[in-house]
Amino acid sequence: MGATGATGPTGPGAPETFAYIYNIGTVEDIPLDGLVPFSNNGLIVGGIAHEPGTPEILINETGIYEITFMVQGDRVNQFALFLNDDLIPGTIYSVGAANIQNTGRVIVSITAPAIISIRNHTSFSPITLETLIGGTQDQVNAAVLIRRIS
């Protein structure tokens, strides 16, 4: 067996831009085309910013992002992701029953600075985000996970 060769160059590290942002507490009657607010910030690292209680999420780093969202409404609904007030194609997700998690996911190219939001896009009516579903503690009724992948 011969000698071990030289160590090659270190590859690129994983992107260090990601965020978990969520809502706890009732949100009454999000109107058609209304924005979903987020009461809390989880871990936010890198070029993403959010002010608790607001619906807009600021992306400060250009790149390719994986975005997953969840909304739990009080009736059948359709929610979608928007980038700078434009619908992101392929992100209208729906559920056909009340109090079920409506979950969507997309990979999208974002040029910073940009604003991401979730909207009650094409539901039949206003949607309420309720609490105390299935138990005695307030649960997360809307959330978004954003991860820069390149």
Regions found by a protein language model. Name each.
Residues 3-150:
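Extracellular jelly-roll beta-sandwich "head" domains, especially the C-terminal globular C1q domain
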